[in-house]
Amino acid sequence: MSEALTEQKSQKWAISLFTIGVFMAALDNGIISAALTTINESFSVSPSWGSWGITLYTLGLSVSVPIVGKLSDRYGRKKLFLIEVCLFGLGSLLVALSQSFPLFLISRLIQALGGGGIFIIGSSHILATLPKEKQGKALGLLGAMNGMAAVLGPNIGSFLLDWTGSWHWLFLINLPIAVLLVVFGACFIAETKAPEAKRLDAAGIFLLSLSILAVMYGMTNLDGANLLHSLGNPEVYGCIIFGILCFAALISYEKRVEMRGGDPILAYSLLRNHMFQRTLIIGLLSGGLLAAVIFIPSYVEQYLGVPAAKAGYWMTPLALASGIGAWLGGALTDKKGPVKTVILSGIISCAGFALFPLWVTEKWEFVIASVAAGIGFGFLLGAPLNVLVSEAAKTNKGTALGTLSLVRQIGLTLAPTLYAGFITAGFDQIGDEINSRLSDSGYSEKAMQMIPEIDSSEVSSLQEQIERIPVPEVKTAISDAIHASVASGYDHLYAAAAVVSLLVIAAISIPAFRRQKR
């Protein structure tokens, strides 16, 4: 009896430590965005160079996730968790102490290699140690922390920057947390790993890393404002084609490794599993839903008229709702199973995102819509997809979870570029919309000449120019035209997110319906 209580207490400690680790790692990619301008000025680099602080972290996460998942299955999840936290802490220290921008970028890469696997290790540990009826809630808790940290990162970064006056503290704050995680993790986390350990698939790791880096780098060079034109950029299509060829070579190689009885980094039999394939598709779509959240601050600023300094705070209702949704999704997965949970997630998120173009005109309406959307996609953040891939993977849970996380990251990288195209299209309509409204109202050519130059720039700068127009009627007509054009761009964006939610429902329900029919 006492042994059972001790084990239960140890499991609670382990889950708490994994939760803190997940929050710390997920927070770091968003927290830097608040200080990006300050960091660029500190190192005297351009914004385009400065953005590499985020891009390199994203690339590092993408590469490390599937590899760490496999290594944790092989060498032990506790051991890899402690190594990952140490790497993340070391990277944070080096970032804070960086005296040059190249060293800053290298340190960010070390951070990413350390933070990338923490969520995967925690999830696979839960799936390996907890009974099935308790896995959902625990995974939901991890998912809640992961989602909330990603959404709240910019706000927390702004607060710390205002409080300390230095961007270095955004990273130094990780050090005491990392030390405590290592100390308590060594004491309370039980070691778990896959039953067999064969020779490490070094060639597979190399091919997988090369494929991920090439595809993700190509995607980061896409331009949402000129999507079709950017696809003709050699840095885009060249990298993506090279990455696809590397992945094809990886599949061929891994098939031979598996046939010879080896231990591939990405099991060929797992990729052929239909449930695993469908779950990866849903994972890709879930990244698309998360990407829609990125545009919330600009939406409330440009459409609802919230000051830029306060726009980020309007992410809070959605962040809290996504955390609640992740927890509810975990509980529902335990009771009703992952398939029904995913279907309900799609229904709620579709309704939430659809409210943006169909209903939202006031701030209180925005809060209701964002809470509904947050609860909906929050369901997908933790339990249901993780349970689905682990059931398909059986023993190689870390590998399966790592692959799922990678695919979600691809969706999260690609979707903002596509969404930005909708916003750009809305801005491009501003000039025509203004001309049309003034002409319909019978204003003269002289009134037309009062219109400021429209170059699809910030709405706030356009509004400043409009305030200088002396004729109130002209001023009102132009303001209404700008508001309508901006609304058009965001309406299409969130309508697309609602469609993505419907695709989630289709991806999980159509195969289930076919199985029942048989």
Curated annotation (Swiss-Prot):
GO terms for cellular component: plasma membrane. GO terms for molecular function: transmembrane transporter activity. It is a multi-pass membrane protein. CDD domains: MFS_MMR_MDR_like. One of its GO terms (biological process) is transmembrane transport. Keywords: Cell membrane, Membrane, Transmembrane, Transmembrane helix, Transport. InterPro entries: MFS (IPR011701), MFS_dom (IPR020846), MFS_trans_sf (IPR036259). The keyword RNA-binding does not apply. Its main location: membrane. Coiled coil: none annotated. It comes from the Bacteria. Belongs to the major facilitator superfamily. TCR/Tet family. This is Uncharacterized MFS-type transporter YfiU. It comes from Bacillus subtilis (strain 168). The lineage of its organism: Bacteria, Bacillati, Bacillota, Bacilli, Bacillales. The gene is yfiU.
